[in-house]
């Protein structure tokens, strides 16, 4: 977020000149923010409290990238080990997306449908990637090997539950989009889930890791 107050949603509302009756709020959850917003929006539509839900997200990697490069150039105490937590910062990209959700009954033309899903959480791994602001600006440090291992383990549990919930199997999806982290993550994930990597749709080679917008921007 560019600032603590007001909400980012208020700037979007003003720029688009939306109705005063429009409910606005920010929903933030690192790289899962857009997916969480889609589930919240879908629940509001199903409950009848909203007819149309506009989800907007933007990721600006420039500040983090610039601060990381500055620190790496200035901190002469860094060695081969202490520099590793900063590597992930150099893969960060920028992007923006907007998603409009509405009930399938309101759509006249064929559109992508949100069919369902499951939730799987491992908050014990929340220390493996931490970032924020300080007097030195925006910063982030990542234990990439441990985060990869924890993420693969969590994805295996999630995929097992998803297949049961949706009555899917490994051959059901025609296209597959994973979180856009990097090539090593991509290979290990497909191997762990026994999925066909030829169905993969990736953007990280061109856009980098675009965080919360990675999935929708790859669509």
Please identify what each model-predicted range represents.
Residues 1-2, 6, 19, 27-46, ...:
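Claisen-condensing/thiolase-fold acyl-transfer catalytic domains that form or cleave C-C bonds
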Residues 3-18, 64-78, 128-133, 185-197:
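Acidic-glycine-rich active-site phosphate/pyrophosphate-binding loop
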Residues 19-23, 47-53, 86-87, 95-96, ...:
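Short coil/turn connectors at secondary-structure junctions
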Residues 23-26, 50-58, 113-120, 171-177, ...:
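Beta-strand segments within the central parallel beta-sheet cores of soluble alpha/beta enzyme folds
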Residues 23-27, 84-87, 142-146, 201-208:
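A short glycine/serine-rich beta->alpha loop
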Residues 33-38, 59, 98-100:
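Alpha-helical metal-binding/catalytic segments enriched in His/Glu/Asp
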Residues 49-69, 122-128, 183:
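Acyl-CoA/ACP chain-elongation machinery
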Residues 75-149, 157-160:
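Condensing-enzyme catalytic core mediating Claisen C-C bond formation in acyl metabolism
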């Amino acid at each position: 977020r560019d600032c603590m107050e007001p909400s980012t949603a208020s700037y979007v509302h003003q720029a688009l000149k939306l109705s005063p009756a429009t409910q606005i709020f920010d929903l933030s959850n690192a790289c899962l923010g857009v997916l969480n917003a889609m589930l919240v929006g879908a629940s509001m539509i199903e409950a009848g409290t909203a007819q149309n839900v506009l989800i907007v997200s933007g990721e600006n990697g420039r500040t983090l990238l610039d601060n990381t490069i500055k620190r790496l150039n200035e901190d002469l105490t860094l060695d081969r080990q202490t520099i590793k937590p900063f590597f992930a910062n150099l893969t960060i990209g920028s992007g923006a997306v907007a998603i409009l959700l509405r009930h399938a009954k309101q759509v006249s033309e064929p559109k992508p449908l949100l069919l369902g899903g499951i939730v799987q959480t491992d908050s014990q791994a929340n220390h493996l990637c931490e970032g924020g602001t300080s007097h030195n600006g925006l910063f982030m440090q990542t234990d990439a090997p441990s985060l990869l291992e924890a993420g693969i383990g969590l994805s295996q549990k999630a995929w097992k539950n998803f297949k049961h919930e949706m009555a899917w199997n490994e051959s059901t999806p025609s296209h597959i989009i994973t979180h856009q982290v990097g090539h090593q993550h991509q290979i290990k994930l497909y191997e762990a889930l026994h999925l066909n990597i030829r169905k993969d749709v990736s953007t990280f080679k061109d856009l980098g890791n675009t965080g919360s917008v990675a999935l929708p921007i790859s669509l």
